[in-house]
Protein backbone atom coordinates (compact mmCIF):
# COMPACT_ATOMS: atom_id res chain seq x y z
CA UNK A 1 0.00 0.00 0.00
CA UNK A 2 1.26 3.44 -0.90
CA UNK A 3 1.97 5.82 1.90
CA UNK A 4 -0.29 8.82 2.42
CA UNK A 5 2.71 11.00 1.60
CA UNK A 6 3.21 9.34 -1.80
CA UNK A 7 -0.50 9.60 -2.67
CA UNK A 8 -0.62 13.30 -1.82
CA UNK A 9 2.61 13.90 -3.77
CA UNK A 10 1.23 12.03 -6.78
CA UNK A 11 -2.00 13.97 -6.80
CA UNK A 12 -0.26 17.28 -6.37
CA UNK A 13 2.30 16.63 -9.09
CA UNK A 14 -0.40 15.34 -11.45
CA UNK A 15 -2.48 18.41 -10.82
CA UNK A 16 0.43 20.68 -11.62
CA UNK A 17 1.05 18.90 -14.92
CA UNK A 18 -2.66 18.90 -15.88
CA UNK A 19 -3.54 22.48 -15.15
CA UNK A 20 -1.12 24.22 -12.86
CA UNK A 21 2.40 25.51 -13.11
CA UNK A 22 3.42 23.24 -15.99
CA UNK A 23 0.24 23.77 -18.05
CA UNK A 24 0.51 25.70 -21.30
CA UNK A 25 -1.17 29.13 -21.04
CA UNK A 26 -4.62 29.40 -22.64
CA UNK A 27 -4.60 31.06 -26.03
CA UNK A 28 -6.28 34.48 -26.03
CA UNK A 29 -9.21 35.04 -28.36
CA UNK A 30 -8.50 38.76 -28.44
CA UNK A 31 -7.94 39.87 -32.02
CA UNK A 32 -9.10 36.54 -33.45
CA UNK A 33 -12.36 38.14 -34.57
CA UNK A 34 -10.32 40.44 -36.81
CA UNK A 35 -9.65 37.50 -39.11
CA UNK A 36 -13.09 38.06 -40.62
CA UNK A 37 -11.81 41.30 -42.18
CA UNK A 38 -9.08 39.61 -44.20
CA UNK A 39 -9.55 40.50 -47.86
CA UNK A 40 -12.63 42.65 -47.21
CA UNK A 41 -13.03 46.27 -48.26
CA UNK A 42 -15.22 48.68 -46.37
CA UNK A 43 -15.52 50.55 -43.10
CA UNK A 44 -15.67 48.46 -39.98
CA UNK A 45 -16.03 49.09 -36.26
CA UNK A 46 -14.46 46.91 -33.59
CA UNK A 47 -16.07 47.25 -30.16
CA UNK A 48 -13.87 45.77 -27.45
CA UNK A 49 -16.10 44.82 -24.52
CA UNK A 50 -15.78 43.05 -21.19
CA UNK A 51 -16.94 39.89 -22.94
CA UNK A 52 -14.86 40.09 -26.11
CA UNK A 53 -14.81 41.86 -29.45
CA UNK A 54 -17.74 42.70 -31.73
CA UNK A 55 -16.80 43.40 -35.35
CA UNK A 56 -19.32 45.42 -37.35
CA UNK A 57 -19.64 46.22 -41.03
CA UNK A 58 -20.79 49.84 -41.38
CA UNK A 59 -23.12 50.65 -44.29
CA UNK A 60 -21.29 53.82 -45.29
CA UNK A 61 -22.64 53.77 -48.85
CA UNK A 62 -26.26 53.14 -47.94
CA UNK A 63 -26.43 55.34 -44.80
CA UNK A 64 -23.52 57.79 -45.08
CA UNK A 65 -24.95 60.39 -42.68
CA UNK A 66 -25.57 57.95 -39.83
CA UNK A 67 -22.20 56.26 -40.33
CA UNK A 68 -20.50 59.67 -40.34
CA UNK A 69 -22.13 60.42 -36.99
CA UNK A 70 -21.02 57.10 -35.51
CA UNK A 71 -17.48 57.25 -36.91
CA UNK A 72 -17.09 60.93 -36.02
CA UNK A 73 -18.05 60.24 -32.42
CA UNK A 74 -15.93 57.10 -32.20
CA UNK A 75 -12.86 58.87 -33.58
CA UNK A 76 -13.52 62.18 -31.84
CA UNK A 77 -13.75 64.22 -35.05
CA UNK A 78 -17.23 65.65 -34.50
CA UNK A 79 -17.49 68.81 -32.43
CA UNK A 80 -19.51 67.06 -29.72
CA UNK A 81 -16.69 64.58 -29.11
CA UNK A 82 -14.21 67.40 -28.37
CA UNK A 83 -11.31 65.55 -29.94
CA UNK A 84 -11.70 62.42 -27.80
CA UNK A 85 -13.18 58.99 -28.59
CA UNK A 86 -16.76 59.51 -27.44
CA UNK A 87 -17.73 55.88 -26.90
CA UNK A 88 -14.67 54.58 -25.08
CA UNK A 89 -15.55 53.59 -21.53
CA UNK A 90 -19.32 53.88 -21.93
CA UNK A 91 -21.66 51.12 -20.79
CA UNK A 92 -24.25 48.97 -22.46
CA UNK A 93 -26.86 50.49 -20.18
CA UNK A 94 -29.82 48.52 -21.52
CA UNK A 95 -29.67 44.80 -22.24
CA UNK A 96 -32.67 42.56 -22.86
CA UNK A 97 -31.57 38.97 -23.29
CA UNK A 98 -31.84 35.55 -21.74
CA UNK A 99 -28.16 35.77 -20.80
CA UNK A 100 -29.03 38.88 -18.82
CA UNK A 101 -31.75 37.01 -16.96
CA UNK A 102 -34.65 38.35 -19.02
CA UNK A 103 -37.44 36.23 -20.42
CA UNK A 104 -36.56 36.89 -24.04
CA UNK A 105 -33.72 37.78 -26.37
CA UNK A 106 -33.92 41.25 -27.92
CA UNK A 107 -30.89 43.54 -28.04
CA UNK A 108 -28.04 45.37 -26.30
CA UNK A 109 -28.02 49.18 -26.21
CA UNK A 110 -25.21 51.62 -25.46
CA UNK A 111 -23.70 54.96 -26.39
CA UNK A 112 -25.22 57.07 -23.62
CA UNK A 113 -22.67 59.19 -21.72
CA UNK A 114 -25.11 59.39 -18.78
CA UNK A 115 -25.53 55.63 -18.71
CA UNK A 116 -29.25 55.73 -18.00
CA UNK A 117 -30.86 56.08 -21.44
CA UNK A 118 -31.42 59.84 -21.27
CA UNK A 119 -28.07 61.10 -22.52
CA UNK A 120 -26.62 61.94 -25.89
CA UNK A 121 -24.11 64.10 -27.74
CA UNK A 122 -26.07 67.33 -27.32
CA UNK A 123 -27.88 67.26 -30.69
CA UNK A 124 -30.44 65.20 -32.58
CA UNK A 125 -30.51 64.28 -36.24
CA UNK A 126 -32.95 62.89 -38.75
CA UNK A 127 -33.68 59.31 -39.75
CA UNK A 128 -31.98 57.77 -42.78
CA UNK A 129 -34.14 54.85 -43.85
CA UNK A 130 -33.20 52.71 -46.83
CA UNK A 131 -35.66 50.44 -48.61
CA UNK A 132 -34.62 46.83 -48.05
CA UNK A 133 -32.59 47.43 -44.88
CA UNK A 134 -34.74 45.62 -42.33
CA UNK A 135 -34.49 43.81 -39.01
CA UNK A 136 -34.96 40.43 -40.70
CA UNK A 137 -32.31 38.73 -38.55
CA UNK A 138 -30.20 39.30 -35.47
CA UNK A 139 -26.95 41.24 -35.58
CA UNK A 140 -28.34 44.51 -36.97
CA UNK A 141 -26.70 47.74 -35.79
CA UNK A 142 -29.20 50.59 -35.52
CA UNK A 143 -29.81 53.96 -33.92
CA UNK A 144 -31.83 54.13 -30.72
CA UNK A 145 -34.31 56.99 -30.57
CA UNK A 146 -37.29 58.41 -28.70
CA UNK A 147 -39.36 58.90 -31.84
CA UNK A 148 -38.94 60.03 -35.42
CA UNK A 149 -35.83 62.11 -36.16
CA UNK A 150 -34.41 62.00 -32.62
CA UNK A 151 -31.13 60.16 -33.24
CA UNK A 152 -28.04 61.05 -31.22
CA UNK A 153 -25.25 58.79 -29.97
CA UNK A 154 -27.18 55.80 -28.62
CA UNK A 155 -27.25 52.65 -30.72
CA UNK A 156 -28.30 49.03 -30.33
CA UNK A 157 -27.40 45.63 -31.75
CA UNK A 158 -30.14 43.04 -32.14
CA UNK A 159 -29.99 39.43 -30.99
CA UNK A 160 -33.01 38.13 -32.91
CA UNK A 161 -35.17 39.34 -35.82
CA UNK A 162 -37.17 42.41 -34.75
CA UNK A 163 -39.16 43.34 -37.83
CA UNK A 164 -41.64 45.49 -35.89
CA UNK A 165 -38.80 48.03 -35.75
CA UNK A 166 -38.53 48.30 -39.55
CA UNK A 167 -38.35 51.94 -40.69
CA UNK A 168 -38.60 53.18 -37.12
CA UNK A 169 -34.87 52.91 -36.37
CA UNK A 170 -32.09 53.60 -38.86
CA UNK A 171 -30.05 50.47 -39.59
CA UNK A 172 -26.46 51.42 -40.41
CA UNK A 173 -24.46 48.22 -40.01
CA UNK A 174 -24.39 44.57 -39.03
CA UNK A 175 -22.29 42.12 -37.04
CA UNK A 176 -19.55 40.31 -38.95
CA UNK A 177 -18.02 38.55 -35.95
CA UNK A 178 -18.79 38.43 -32.25
CA UNK A 179 -22.52 37.79 -32.31
CA UNK A 180 -21.86 35.34 -29.48
CA UNK A 181 -20.46 38.29 -27.52
CA UNK A 182 -23.60 40.33 -28.24
CA UNK A 183 -25.77 37.43 -27.12
CA UNK A 184 -23.89 36.91 -23.85
CA UNK A 185 -23.29 40.47 -22.59
CA UNK A 186 -25.00 41.59 -19.42
CA UNK A 187 -26.35 45.01 -18.56
CA UNK A 188 -23.57 47.32 -17.44
CA UNK A 189 -20.89 45.76 -19.65
CA UNK A 190 -18.25 48.28 -20.73
CA UNK A 191 -17.20 49.34 -24.20
CA UNK A 192 -13.48 49.51 -23.53
CA UNK A 193 -12.88 50.99 -26.97
CA UNK A 194 -14.52 51.50 -30.35
CA UNK A 195 -12.01 51.43 -33.19
CA UNK A 196 -12.79 52.27 -36.82
CA UNK A 197 -11.01 50.38 -39.59
CA UNK A 198 -11.02 51.48 -43.23
CA UNK A 199 -9.97 48.96 -45.87
CA UNK A 200 -9.82 49.68 -49.59
CA UNK A 201 -9.19 52.91 -51.49
CA UNK A 202 -12.79 54.12 -51.36
CA UNK A 203 -13.18 53.47 -47.65
CA UNK A 204 -9.91 55.20 -46.85
CA UNK A 205 -11.25 58.40 -48.43
CA UNK A 206 -14.24 58.43 -46.08
CA UNK A 207 -13.93 61.25 -43.56
CA UNK A 208 -16.23 62.06 -40.66
CA UNK A 209 -15.70 65.72 -39.84
CA UNK A 210 -18.36 68.11 -38.59
CA UNK A 211 -18.48 69.68 -42.05
CA UNK A 212 -19.11 66.25 -43.60
CA UNK A 213 -21.90 65.54 -41.15
CA UNK A 214 -23.56 68.94 -41.63
CA UNK A 215 -23.52 68.55 -45.41
CA UNK A 216 -24.97 65.05 -45.28
CA UNK A 217 -27.77 66.14 -42.96
CA UNK A 218 -28.94 68.65 -45.56
CA UNK A 219 -28.71 66.09 -48.36
CA UNK A 220 -30.63 63.44 -46.44
CA UNK A 221 -33.29 65.95 -45.35
CA UNK A 222 -33.89 66.87 -48.99
CA UNK A 223 -33.99 63.21 -50.05
CA UNK A 224 -36.42 62.40 -47.23
CA UNK A 225 -38.73 65.23 -48.29
CA UNK A 226 -38.73 64.03 -51.89
CA UNK A 227 -39.39 60.44 -50.84
CA UNK A 228 -42.24 61.46 -48.53
CA UNK A 229 -43.74 63.60 -51.29
CA UNK A 230 -43.78 60.57 -53.61
CA UNK A 231 -45.33 58.38 -50.93
CA UNK A 232 -47.98 61.00 -50.20
CA UNK A 233 -48.79 61.33 -53.88
CA UNK A 234 -49.36 57.57 -54.01
CA UNK A 235 -51.59 57.66 -50.91
CA UNK A 236 -53.96 60.31 -52.31
CA UNK A 237 -53.77 59.18 -55.93
CA UNK A 238 -57.23 59.52 -57.46
CA UNK A 239 -58.67 61.12 -54.32
CA UNK A 240 -60.78 64.26 -54.05
CA UNK A 241 -59.98 66.80 -51.34
CA UNK A 242 -63.00 67.61 -49.21
CA UNK A 243 -63.47 71.16 -47.89
CA UNK A 244 -62.69 69.80 -44.41
CA UNK A 245 -59.23 68.64 -45.51
CA UNK A 246 -60.13 64.95 -45.75
CA UNK A 247 -59.12 63.19 -48.96
CA UNK A 248 -61.56 60.57 -50.22
CA UNK A 249 -62.18 58.21 -53.11
CA UNK A 250 -65.31 56.20 -53.84
CA UNK A 251 -64.20 52.62 -54.44
CA UNK A 252 -67.69 51.16 -54.90
CA UNK A 253 -70.88 53.11 -55.60
CA UNK A 254 -73.83 52.84 -53.23
CA UNK A 255 -77.56 53.30 -53.78
CA UNK A 256 -80.17 55.73 -52.57
CA UNK A 257 -79.64 58.98 -50.74
CA UNK A 258 -76.68 59.97 -48.59
CA UNK A 259 -76.74 58.85 -44.97
CA UNK A 260 -76.85 62.24 -43.24
CA UNK A 261 -76.84 63.11 -39.53
CA UNK A 262 -78.51 61.27 -36.68
CA UNK A 263 -78.64 57.87 -38.37
CA UNK A 264 -77.87 54.54 -36.73
CA UNK A 265 -75.33 53.02 -39.07
CA UNK A 266 -73.34 49.83 -39.39
CA UNK A 267 -70.04 49.82 -41.27
CA UNK A 268 -67.23 47.49 -42.18
CA UNK A 269 -63.87 49.21 -41.99
CA UNK A 270 -60.11 48.91 -42.23
CA UNK A 271 -57.89 51.49 -40.55
CA UNK A 272 -54.29 51.84 -41.68
CA UNK A 273 -51.38 54.25 -41.72
CA UNK A 274 -50.18 55.93 -44.89
CA UNK A 275 -47.46 53.27 -45.19
CA UNK A 276 -50.14 50.58 -45.36
CA UNK A 277 -49.75 49.25 -41.82
CA UNK A 278 -53.18 48.14 -40.56
CA UNK A 279 -54.06 49.14 -36.99
CA UNK A 280 -57.70 47.99 -36.85
CA UNK A 281 -60.30 46.26 -39.03
CA UNK A 282 -63.64 44.49 -39.06
CA UNK A 283 -64.20 41.07 -40.57
CA UNK A 284 -65.49 42.53 -43.80
CA UNK A 285 -61.93 43.65 -44.55
CA UNK A 286 -59.87 41.20 -42.50
CA UNK A 287 -60.55 37.55 -41.55
CA UNK A 288 -59.41 38.16 -37.97
CA UNK A 289 -61.24 41.47 -37.63
CA UNK A 290 -64.06 42.60 -35.34
CA UNK A 291 -67.80 42.67 -35.84
CA UNK A 292 -69.06 45.56 -38.02
CA UNK A 293 -68.96 48.92 -36.23
CA UNK A 294 -72.31 50.38 -35.12
CA UNK A 295 -72.71 54.04 -34.16
CA UNK A 296 -74.93 57.09 -34.56
CA UNK A 297 -73.73 59.70 -37.02
CA UNK A 298 -73.02 63.14 -35.58
CA UNK A 299 -73.33 61.61 -32.12
CA UNK A 300 -69.79 62.41 -30.99
CA UNK A 301 -68.83 58.74 -30.86
CA UNK A 302 -66.33 58.72 -33.69
CA UNK A 303 -63.36 60.85 -34.74
CA UNK A 304 -64.70 63.86 -36.70
CA UNK A 305 -63.21 63.01 -40.10
CA UNK A 306 -64.59 59.47 -40.04
CA UNK A 307 -68.08 60.55 -38.95
CA UNK A 308 -68.19 63.35 -41.51
CA UNK A 309 -67.33 61.03 -44.38
CA UNK A 310 -69.87 58.35 -43.38
CA UNK A 311 -72.60 61.02 -43.33
CA UNK A 312 -71.94 61.63 -47.03
CA UNK A 313 -71.97 57.94 -48.03
CA UNK A 314 -74.81 55.87 -49.50
CA UNK A 315 -75.72 52.36 -48.34
CA UNK A 316 -73.56 49.83 -50.17
CA UNK A 317 -70.85 52.39 -50.88
CA UNK A 318 -67.19 51.69 -50.13
CA UNK A 319 -65.03 54.75 -49.64
CA UNK A 320 -61.36 55.36 -48.96
CA UNK A 321 -60.66 58.20 -46.51
CA UNK A 322 -57.36 59.90 -45.73
CA UNK A 323 -57.96 61.92 -42.58
CA UNK A 324 -55.66 64.71 -41.31
CA UNK A 325 -54.54 64.55 -37.67
CA UNK A 326 -56.74 67.45 -36.54
CA UNK A 327 -59.79 65.40 -37.58
CA UNK A 328 -58.34 62.12 -36.31
CA UNK A 329 -56.09 61.49 -33.29
CA UNK A 330 -54.29 64.82 -33.16
CA UNK A 331 -50.77 65.47 -31.97
CA UNK A 332 -50.87 62.68 -29.39
CA UNK A 333 -51.92 59.82 -31.66
CA UNK A 334 -52.52 56.42 -30.08
CA UNK A 335 -49.04 54.97 -29.45
CA UNK A 336 -50.39 51.68 -28.11
CA UNK A 337 -52.13 51.12 -31.45
CA UNK A 338 -49.08 52.15 -33.43
CA UNK A 339 -50.56 55.50 -34.48
CA UNK A 340 -47.95 58.25 -34.05
CA UNK A 341 -48.82 61.78 -33.07
CA UNK A 342 -49.62 64.15 -35.92
CA UNK A 343 -50.31 61.30 -38.34
CA UNK A 344 -52.67 61.21 -41.29
CA UNK A 345 -54.65 57.98 -41.09
CA UNK A 346 -56.56 56.05 -43.73
CA UNK A 347 -59.79 54.09 -43.64
CA UNK A 348 -61.55 51.95 -46.18
CA UNK A 349 -65.21 51.97 -45.12
CA UNK A 350 -68.30 50.17 -46.44
CA UNK A 351 -71.68 51.47 -45.29
CA UNK A 352 -73.78 48.36 -44.60
CA UNK A 353 -76.94 50.02 -43.29
CA UNK A 354 -78.34 53.38 -42.18
CA UNK A 355 -81.62 53.77 -40.27
Spans of model-derived segments:
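Cross-family detector of peptidyl-prolyl cis-trans isomerase
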Residues: 2-8, 19-355
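Sec-dependent N-terminal signal peptides of Gram-positive bacterial secreted proteins and lipoproteins
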Residues: 11-17
Amino acid sequence: MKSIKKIIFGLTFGSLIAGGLFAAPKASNKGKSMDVLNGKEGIFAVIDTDGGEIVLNLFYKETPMTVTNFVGLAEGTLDAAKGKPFYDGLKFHRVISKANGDGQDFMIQGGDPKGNGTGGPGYKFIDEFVDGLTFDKGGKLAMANSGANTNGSQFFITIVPTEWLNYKHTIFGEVLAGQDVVDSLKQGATMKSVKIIRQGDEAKKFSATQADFDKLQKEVAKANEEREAKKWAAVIDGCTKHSSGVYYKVLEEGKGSVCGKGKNVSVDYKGYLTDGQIFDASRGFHPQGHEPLDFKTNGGQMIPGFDMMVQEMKVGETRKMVIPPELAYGSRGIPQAGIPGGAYICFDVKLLSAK
